[in-house]
Amino acid sequence: MKLKNIKISNYRCFKKAEIDFDDHITLVVGKNGAGKTAILDTIAVSVSTFLLGIDGGVSRSILKEDARYEFHNLNGTIDPQHQFPVIIETMGDCLNRSDIKWTRSLNSESGKTTVKEAGELTGLAKKAQNQIMTGDKSLVLPLISYYGTGRLYSQKKEKRNLKSLTEFKRQVGYVDCMAAESNEKLMLNWFQMQTLKSLQEQQKTGMLERPLLLKTVEKAICRSFERISDARNTSLFFDLDTHRLVLEFESADGSAQKFAMDEMSDGYKNTLSMIGDIAYRMAVLNPTLGDQVLEKTPGVVLIDEIDLHLHPQWQQTILSDLHAIFPEIQFIVSSHAPAVINSVPREQIRILDHGEIYMPAAQTYGRDANSILREVMNVSERPAEIKQRMDLFYAYMDENNYKEADRVLTEIETIVGTTDPDIAAARTSLDLERILGE
């Protein structure tokens, strides 16, 4: 599955908007309140339409609260009114079919999200469901998953009987896939089941050999951890006593280290758990792909605030890391971190600004953080107080009032220091002007 574009009407802050997507990575940026989460929620409604054709699948709906408000002034009385219909139109590819179109809409406050104009996509899903029932080994199911900002602290309350899921039939790969909050229980249960399988096999054969899919999922987590740390020879195992995932590795000084994943910092824990969840869902959806399941499973993954609790060093590589590990996945993510924005080219960025969606005019890849703040986020790279003093300094310089320019620059140096490149350049400029003026 891949999305090409979405058109939306009357969804939250958007009266009308259209966004097209890169095949691999689309980064949605904007200030807080610009509508980044609204765009991801729109996409979640769209892609989860596929789940309507899968047994046990749960699709996201358009809620009446999602309808855009208009405020009418009636002789001094403000009358807020929801605007209908709310429409989400999508074009994309799925299960070897190109340029499929489907529409979901909500036509009134008391209405339900329509599905009648999504028949082509749900028809493909129903066909896939029949293939699942008949054990078709050639069927490669798309991964669909959404990781919202609640994924770190808000755990999904599991209402299902988890014992009933220990079989992990293929459809279980879609359970809670659209829940913006985290649900690690299913992933941990899968690790537990795979670990017990390997122990059972050891009893039969006398050899301890972990299942191929388990090793593949472990590899995704270990590979990610090594890319963002100085760790070497990393391994992962499920501790049956504590019901936790544990990483063992060599640190940079060669010493052996061992940490449970849930003991790590928020950035490590959040991102490694997310990567593990993606990999485990792939393994459940497409077990016949074996050790190629990470490389060959297609799909759409949505991540709100990809930079959540990440160190800037990992912010710069997280998108390329995800694409390297899961090359057939279309990642649609949001962020306002300069270190994330300058890690991708402008063609993969969509800026949200007062209800408009557009691509940056200038190239973004490799740019310094200050220019990203200034040109993409429309934010000053310095606090307003320092910017005002710098403007005053250059105003005095233009007037050849070097005494006042020196006074203002000295005040700035007291606050910022003398090693800042811009401040050092300003001091050099002032000294040169004084020499030339003598």
Residue ranges and their predicted role:
Residues 42, 89, 146, 216-227, ...:
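Amphipathic alpha-helical segments that form well-ordered structural scaffolds
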Residues 1-187, 394, 417-438:
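P-loop NTPase switch/coupling surface
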Residues 46, 190-197, 281, 389-399:
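Solvent-exposed, amphipathic alpha-helical segments
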Residues 320, 324, 339-438:
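RecA-like P-loop NTPase motor core
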Residues 173-296, 405:
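Extended helical coiled-coil dimerization/tether regions that scaffold
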Residues 144-148, 237-239, 299-305:
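Extended hydrophobic secondary-structure segments that form protein cores and membrane-embedded regions
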Residues 1-58, 244-381:
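Switch/communication elements of ASCE P-loop NTPase nucleotide-binding domains
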